[in-house]
Amino acid sequence: MGNLPSAAKHCLNYQQLLREHLWSGDSVAGALDAAQEASQLPGLPEYVKIVEVGPRDGLQNEKVIVPTDIKIELINQLSQTGLSVIEVTSFVSSRWVPQMADHAEVMRGIRQYPGVRYPVLTPNLQGFQHAVAAGATEIAVFGAASESFSKKNINCSIEESMGRFQEVISSARHMDIPVRGYVSCALGCPYEGSITPQKVTEVSKRLYGMGCYEISLGDTIGVGTPGSMKMMLESVMKEIPPGALAVHCHDTYGQALANILTALQMGINVVDSAVSGLGGCPYAKGASGNVATEDLIYMLNGMGLNTGVDLYKVMEAGEFICKAVNKTTNSKVAQASFNARLE
């Protein structure tokens, strides 16, 4: 190939490049170095809370049942990364979501680390009661902005779901158990197509009014763009303050990080993600996984935003679960790291 230019001879390999960009150490502890401070973009929150949904939303769509001990080990590994919220399981009927049939065993088996919250999903009062009996101290309810999706996902209309949620939330508040609310199909539905921002706002407002401390707005099938994200959030934020909102983006069309950046620029500072980009949706064929936690942290680190999460440790947890379920990671950052080790 002839003589290479001297600059090319000294080109950094992937591993060196990763070390330049995968910030940890002081940033994990909450302090930013000079380079990180210089990279901060104006108008963005200084801190972003990441809600890790891999053990629940990420694994629920796996066709092969993941052994309970693998789920427990994944959660325990994630608990040591600096993540403050890890959604661990769902107290739904095993007939509808067989992957979550071991919810009580998972709750009993995990080690609950100080400073980490472990919410679970509960679709109705019975699920809530089972969750509390298993030791849950925080729950979430999951509604939809699409009538068709609500009927497919939780087997009832939106109006009927609100009645169920009111029962759950009232019981939870009586026991001082915080409740998070999910709104699926916030940017599109696999059955109805486009969903109006007004519909998303209506459902979100009702959940917030019932007492949900935070509303997570989900792009369930990953069709959103920064433009549609902006329009939806502008509508919802007329009724709910940005500090009580989160975004939950799937990456079907490769728009998740762009959509998240849009949300951050609008004042949102809570983002859902899944280790290794695990996930999909059992009621939305073709939907790919959640935005990968590794890729999200990499982007946030690169903008000088603090998450308190150690990216290296998240990648280790991702490598563990991908080997356990015989999958290739969906995280671009993890893929780059793996390729670097092959050099």
Swiss-Prot record:
Lipidation (N-myristoyl glycine): G2
Membrane topology annotation: Peripheral membrane protein
Pathway participation: Metabolic intermediate metabolism; (S)-3-hydroxy-3-methylglutaryl-CoA degradation; acetoacetate from (S)-3-hydroxy-3-methylglutaryl-CoA: step 1/1
Binding site for a divalent metal cation: D57, H248, H250, N290
Active-site residue list: C281
Any GO MF annotation of the entry: hydroxymethylglutaryl-CoA lyase activity
Cofactor(s) named in the record: a divalent metal cation
Catalytic activity: (3S)-3-hydroxy-3-methylglutaryl-CoA = acetoacetate + acetyl-CoA
Subcellular location: Cytoplasm, Cytosol; Endoplasmic reticulum membrane
Listed EC numbers: 4.1.3.4
Keyword Phosphoprotein: no
Keyword Secreted included in the entry's annotation: no
Domain named Pyruvate carboxyltransferase: residues: 48-315
One of the record's GO cellular component terms: perinuclear region of cytoplasm
GO terms (BP aspect): ketone body biosynthetic process
Keywords: Cytoplasm, Endoplasmic reticulum, Lipid metabolism, Lipoprotein, Lyase, Membrane, Metal-binding, Myristate
Chief place of localization: cytoplasm
One matching Pfam family: HMGL-like
Binding site for substrate: R56
Family: Belongs to the HMG-CoA lyase family.
Alphabetical list of NCBIfam families matching this protein: PRK05692.1
Biological function: Non-mitochondrial 3-hydroxy-3-methylglutaryl-CoA lyase that catalyzes a cation-dependent cleavage of (S)-3-hydroxy-3-methylglutaryl-CoA into acetyl-CoA and acetoacetate, a key step in ketogenesis, the products of which support energy production in nonhepatic animal tissues.
Name of the protein in its database record: 3-hydroxy-3-methylglutaryl-CoA lyase, cytoplasmic
Annotated organism of origin: Mus musculus (Mouse)
